[in-house]
Amino acid sequence: MKQLEELLSTSFDIQFNDLTLLETAFTHTSYANEHRLLNVSHNERLEFLGDAVLQLIISEYLFAKYPKKTEGDMSKLRSMIVREESLAGFSRFCSFDAYIKLGKGEEKSGGRRRDTILGDLFEAFLGALLLDKGIDAVRRFLKQVMIPQVEKGNFERVKDYKTCLQEFLQTKGDVAIDYQVISEKGPAHAKQFEVSIVVNGAVLSKGLGKSKKLAEQDAAKNALAQLSEV
């Protein structure tokens, strides 16, 4: 934790008052499950809070930055900015991936490189920062880390995987694409959806996500990867 504190201080001028919050933000459920007797807290609740404040601040930014964009345009752009892959990238940019506490099994299976875990970590950190320093501190951090990428227009040029898949398949002729929920597991605050993509009656791929939309995106991403190998 000492090295993480030094990183936050030197790179982002952030000094946490409540180090328990910071430690919780960097504790994955797999680590907490392996240390139940120690009553270790994990970062899912902070992730929930961080997701909400991230959506708010990015919405504020887009509203002020693009006065001529419609609600639909801003929603699409916000989705691109806060998508899982983007947040995982920001975790890596901040070197957060080096400090997350994972269970032994998760560590061995490559969890430290997994976008889902790193995206959740970034949101959990924002939640901890909100509770410790307030929303203005979160705004300053995002202005330093995320907004410069948005200013460069990197996200405006990104299409979502569902759109890319639809455009690719349509080049092959008329196709019927259907996204079907296979399963829905877990408590309300930590849902896990599995979705399949059915094209002309045949299953093309499957995907997982914390919401139906994220699972659909994951399935479309997997489908594009499969089709690129054909």
From Swiss-Prot:
The protein's matches in InterPro entries, at most eight in alphabetical order, are given as:
dsRBD_dom, RNase_III, RNase_III_dom, RNase_III_sf
Q: Which GO terms label this protein's molecular function in UniProt?
A: double-stranded RNA binding; metal ion binding; ribonuclease III activity; rRNA binding
User: Listed GO cellular component terms?
Assistant: cytoplasm
RNase III domain location: 1-134
* Occurrences of domain DRBM (ranges): 160-229
Q: Where is the active site?
A: D51, E123
Q: Where in the cell is it found?
A: Cytoplasm
Which enzyme class, named as a word?
hydrolase
Q: Name one Pfam family in it.
A: Ribonucleas_3_3
Q: What is the E.C. number?
A: 3.1.26.3
Would you indicate the residue range of the signal peptide?
none
- Cofactor(s) needed: Mg(2+)
The UniProt family comment states: Belongs to the ribonuclease III family.
Recorded protein name is: Ribonuclease 3
